[in-house]
């Protein structure tokens, strides 16, 4: 099964915005018109890193997909980058008080459902000039719903 990566990515961006209260660009810096905070630091950038499929062979529509996303949080200070990354981590991994549901749902297009989420890799913080970046990779497991 191939899932619509761009549509899934847009749903993930909306989840990051809900959790962080900051703008998130799609493979680029958010524009000054991006909601809720434009291109002001801190902000997030989401990159699609591809998808793999599992389950039934030969492109069966009932197969599952694992989509990989990188989120780079950019801030003017180490604290801003780190706390922004904490909010992104909460967006992907946060659970409700009873642990039964995700704290921040990823609302997918009709016909798809999130089965799971995981932190794939956390590269941590780097600095270039006076700009700090914190890089994380997350996997989102999707099935037909």
Give short role names for the model-derived ranges.
Residues 92-144:
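Acidic-leaning, charged glycine-interspersed low-complexity segments
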Residues 2-3, 75, 125-128:
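Charge-dense, low-complexity intrinsically disordered segments
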Residues 58-63, 127-129:
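Short, solvent-exposed beta-strand/turn "edge" segments of beta-rich domains on protein surfaces
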Residues 63-81, 88, 131-142:
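Oligomerization/assembly interface segments of phage tail-like spikes and tubes
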Residues 5-10, 78-81, 85:
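Generic alpha-helical secondary structure
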Residues 1-59, 95-108:
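Small/polar-rich, solvent-exposed N-terminal microdomains that initiate assembly or binding
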Residues 55, 80-82, 145:
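Intrinsically disordered, low-complexity acidic/polar segments
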């Amino acid at each position: 099964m191939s899932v619509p990566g761009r549509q899934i990515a847009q749903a993930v961006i909306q989840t990051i915005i809900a959790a962080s209260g900051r703008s998130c660009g799609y493979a680029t810096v958010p524009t000054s018109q991006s909601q809720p905070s434009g291109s002001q630091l801190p902000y997030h950038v989401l990159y699609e890193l591809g998808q793999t499929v599992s389950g039934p062979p030969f492109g069966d529509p009932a197969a599952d997909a694992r989509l990989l996303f990188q989120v780079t949080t950019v801030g003017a200070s180490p604290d801003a980058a780190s706390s922004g990354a904490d909010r992104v981590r909460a967006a992907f991994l946060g659970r409700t008080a009873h642990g039964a549901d995700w704290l921040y749902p990823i609302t997918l297009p009709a016909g798809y459902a999130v089965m799971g989420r995981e932190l794939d890799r956390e590269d941590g913080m780097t600095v270039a000039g006076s700009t700090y970046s914190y890089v994380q990779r997350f996997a989102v497991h999707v099935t037909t719903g």
